[in-house]
């Protein structure tokens, strides 16, 4: 199950004009891990896909009055995910701590690719302009948001056996570079906003516990935490670069999972 929030920003210079909070709750994920070891060298890939989002909402804030810190426009919508893909490839080195090689520390490099499609539907709005307040309800698909982010990371970790059948594994990685393209489609105004964003600090951590059943089978319970601070870059409006605006993206997600591991050889 996956939970968390992605935030979309629009700036004019250093002034924040807009922020959209895309909040997901209890997304069901399916996926797999494949790992191959050759002595102390290993290769791995991970794939996950979001099947269903039980609950979620999107909140849209605008600050159109630069003389006030209060937001002038607000809307709230139901959120659903039509796509949530996460793929990574690892290459690393293991350093055994004893003869069996079951206890080890490791260093690795990783490429990570994410492609998510958020959809905001129905909801209501409350706008304040020139001292007047207008309110109303919205129906149907209002906004879609598609951040596509790729990151290059370096990390370290280790695997440690507490008993003959019970072990835990921990890994932490930080990005050297993150970049992406985030596309916002406002269906009511028929405007498409696209941000080409860049940044460096992306932190990922994983902790999992494994129960072995013989030499080849394990049951695993684990969790991941990912924190991506602000990525920022050029904004394009309906295909044309904006002279005054820049866009931004940030996210924080965590998930818990059960899996079954089979060692083939």
Question: Where are the regions that the model predicts?
Answer:
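Extended, basic/helix-rich recognition subdomains
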Residues: 180, 210, 218-222, 230
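Extracellular/periplasm-exposed beta-strand and loop segments of Gram-negative cell-envelope proteins
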Residues: 3-27, 49-87, 113-149, 175-206, ...
């Amino acid at each position: 199950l996956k939970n968390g929030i992605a935030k979309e920003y629009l700036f004019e210079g250093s002034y924040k004009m807009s922020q959209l909070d895309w909040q997901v709750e209890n997304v069901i994920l399916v996926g797999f891990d494949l790992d191959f070891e050759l002595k102390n060298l290993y290769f791995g890939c991970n794939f996950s896909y979001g099947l269903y989002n039980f609950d979620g909402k999107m909140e849209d804030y605008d600050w159109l009055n630069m003389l006030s810190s209060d937001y002038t426009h607000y809307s709230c919508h139901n959120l659903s995910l039509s796509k949530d893909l996460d793929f990574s490839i690892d290459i690393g080195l293991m350093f055994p701590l004893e003869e069996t090689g079951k206890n080890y520390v490791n260093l690795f490099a990783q490429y990570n690719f994410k492609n998510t499609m958020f959809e905001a539907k129905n909801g209501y709005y409350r706008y304040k302009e020139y001292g007047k307040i207008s309110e109303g309800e919205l129906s149907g698909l209002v906004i879609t948001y598609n951040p596509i982010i790729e990151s290059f990371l370096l990390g370290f970790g280790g695997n440690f056996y507490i008993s003959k059948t019970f072990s835990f594994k921990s890994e932490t990685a930080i990005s050297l570079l993150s970049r992406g393209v985030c596309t916002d489609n406002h269906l009511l105004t028929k405007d498409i906003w696209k941000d080409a964003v860049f940044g460096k600090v992306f932190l990922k951590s994983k902790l999992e516990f494994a129960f072995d059943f013989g030499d080849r089978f394990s049951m695993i319970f684990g969790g991941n935490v990912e924190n991506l601070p602000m990525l920022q870059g050029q904004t394009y409006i309906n295909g044309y670069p904006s002279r005054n605006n820049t866009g931004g993206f940030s996210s924080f997600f965590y998930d818990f999972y059960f899996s079954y591991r089979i060692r083939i050889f």
